[in-house]
Amino acid sequence: MSSGHFFQGHWCDVFKCTMRCLSCTHTLSLVLCVLALTPATLEAGPETLCGAELVDTLQFVCGDRGFYFSKPTGYGPSSRRSHNRGIVDECCFQSCELRRLEMYCAPVKPGKTPRSVRAQRHTDSPRTAKKPLPGQSHSSYKEVHQKNSSRGNTGGRNYRI
């Protein structure tokens, strides 16, 4: 075997070994990264909701119906269990699902339909002041109070001096 062929073969073996080591290093790094990130994703299962987050979520889920912090008696499948558990016990101290949140929504009131835009404009418009009819005097409370106090009228109250 010639020395040139030996060095060429040796360098090929070294190169292959180096590539394998680099490949192993990359693979090991990738595996370590995945393992480092995996526990965070496994632990991040269902969340707990407390305080303002719980209220905001209930408002979103229940909408215009409103919600209760404790279930009304006889409401929902857990009415047979103890009645002292509320939404905080069920969703703040442990995780809860959407179904559990919906159990705390107030029931839909029958016959209550959203107002139409036309009705809203009509009922929400500012009231105009009524004009007194001819021959009637329209005095404000301030004017009446000033008249009564100038006459010495105390409104039925007796004052001693």
Swiss-Prot record:
GO molecular function, one term: insulin-like growth factor receptor binding
Gene3D superfamilies per the UniProt record, alphabetical: Insulin-like
GO cellular component: extracellular space
Key words of the record: Disulfide bond, Growth factor, Secreted, Signal
Top-level division of the source organism's lineage: Eukaryota
Bridged cysteine pairs (disulfide): 50-92, 62-105, 91-96
Region span, D: 107-114
Principal location class: secreted
Residues making up the propeptide: 115-161
Subcellular location field: Secreted
Region (B): 45-73
Region C, residue ranges: 74-85
Keyword Cell inner membrane carried by entry: no
Region ranges (A): 86-106
Residues covered by region (Disordered): 111-161
Family as reported in the entry's similarity comment: Belongs to the insulin family.
PANTHER family the record matches: INSULIN-LIKE GROWTH FACTOR 1, INSULIN-LIKE GROWTH FACTOR I
Name the UniProt record assigns to this protein: Insulin-like growth factor 1, juvenile form
